[in-house]
Amino acid sequence: PGSTIKPIVALSALENKIINTKFKVHCKGHKNPLELYGQTYHCWKKEGHGLLNLREAMKQSCDTYFYEVARRLGVDKLSETAKKFGLGEKVFNNLFDNEKSGLVPSTFWKKNALGKNWLLGETIITGIGQGYIQTTPIQLCLMTAQIANGGYKIYPKIIIDDSINEDDKFQSLVNQTNNIKIIQDAMFSSTNELRGT
């Protein structure tokens, strides 16, 4: 999914009290990349973004910021939040035979599926939507809609008739409503402000 995963990474870090809105990371682009076990991780912006808080990092889609957030958060907490928002599972619950569930990786998943331990570098790249993580377009729509609606679970359906489904209840997906507002504002800034990506 690439950078479309960044709102969930940020929300998960806020919900787990790993960061707050004042948490800053200095992005130096290609000048001083993060080096870990022989791998180099740098931002997409060659000259870097400078010192960024959450809102600015989301607006400018700074990879360096999200590497650090993912590193602090850990893949298991990120996985838990992503699954709450519908990633890693079929959206229409067997309505379509060819719908894919995608993949939200975790330490348990890798050990169980591949027989290997999870690596810190894998957490870092998961923070920018790279590596094992896989999503479908409808999952990303659902994730975004649930952020936009204030963090409430949506049960999408194909409308056959207009009867009301009693299963449609307002189930909050977040611990603190302020966290979802922070993410909404950052997403808005990405598309509506100068330097937004």
Language-model regions: role of each:
Residues 1-3, 8-197:
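Beta-lactam-recognizing serine transpeptidase/beta-lactamase-like catalytic domain environment
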